[in-house]
Amino acid sequence: MEVAEPSSPTEEEEEEEEHSAEPRPHTRSNPEGAEDRAVAAQASVGSHSEGEGEAASADDGSPSTSGAGPKSWQVPPPAPEVQIRTPRVNCPEKVIICLDLSEEMSLPKLESFNGSKTNALNISQKMIEMFVRTKHKIDKSHEFALVVVNDDTAWLSGLTSDPRELCSCLYDLETASCSTFNLEGLFSLIQQKTEFPVTENVQTIPPPYVVRTILVYSRPPCQPQFSLTEPMKKMFQCPYFFFDLVYIHNGAEEKEEEMSWKDMFAFMGSLDTKGTSYKYEVALAGPALELHNCMVKLLAHPLQRPCQSHASYSLLEEEDEATEVEATV
């Protein structure tokens, strides 16, 4: 009588187990590979922010928002973030300051330093002048432009390295009732007036300059007129373009069926696909000092500052360490 060898079925079972274990779900175990594929598709995309590679690769390949329920607020689908380190150099900046002239900017709700009420336009004009003059003292090669936004967008002051030239256009402004916010028109104007630098190697060669847009915005929540065109997408993906925001909102919680200022703030934040922009929100009925503090934090050079979530403005991380830390020269 012949007896079958016990090893034969065991080997077949092992092979079946190996084959059944091969198809595994996609994981985040290789974020570097995912980033390499993204870099090949978008060679000009860049970011010097850190600690966000895995989260970015997890979102890759899911641009569709059809699974979400019907909602009137349309937020652009999140784009995959690509981590490319840029040289942390203090190269010249071309700063385009965009000032909202909606009627909300003229409401006397902010608390000034002496306790009286003032409006956001008055405080914004002062903090913009202080910002421009301070940046000019840091580096006289910085250039500044002023754009005002109501129903339309107007380029008041061209790029100049003379702060007096911009400040001469800053104070003769009037607010108006605005029905819409043409965000697409604003970015299209910036693209027409500005040339974005290109380098042979983003990671090692410093750019001749960087372009930064600072939007001071104050309106009730409303869906902006905006569609992400291909030229606009390239602008946001450019490693030398930065979009900073100071959003002055009413601070009130709207009803559930209405749009909230938080929705608008999230919408503006979703435009930054590199994680390099800074965004601040200030209540319209709060102290004016908060607006000044936001503008002071924007003085840092975009290539030298960390991502906003890592930024710290305290001298000491822990109050308990105050007695242990000594200044050394």
UniProtKB/Swiss-Prot annotation:
- Please indicate if the UniProt record lists Signal as a keyword: no
SUPFAM superfamilies per UniProt: vWA-like
Is the keyword Transport assigned to this protein?
no
Give the region (Disordered) as residue ranges: 1-86
Chain positions found as Phosphoserine: 8, 29, 49, 57, 62, 66
Q: Which family does it belong to?
A: Belongs to the BABAM1 family.
On subunit structure and binding partners, the annotation says: Component of the ARISC complex, at least composed of UIMC1/RAP80, ABRAXAS1, BRCC3/BRCC36, BABAM2 and BABAM1/NBA1. Component of the BRCA1-A complex, at least composed of BRCA1, BARD1, UIMC1/RAP80, ABRAXAS1, BRCC3/BRCC36, BABAM2 and BABAM1/NBA1. In the BRCA1-A complex, interacts directly with ABRAXAS1 and BABAM2. Component of the BRISC complex, at least composed of ABRAXAS2, BRCC3/BRCC36, BABAM2 and BABAM1/NBA1. Identified in a complex with SHMT2 and the other subunits of the BRISC complex.
User: What's the domain remark here?
Assistant: The VWFA-like region is similar to the VWFA domain. Its presence reveals similarities between the structure of the 19S proteasome and the BRCA1-A complexes.
What protein does this entry describe?
BRISC and BRCA1-A complex member 1
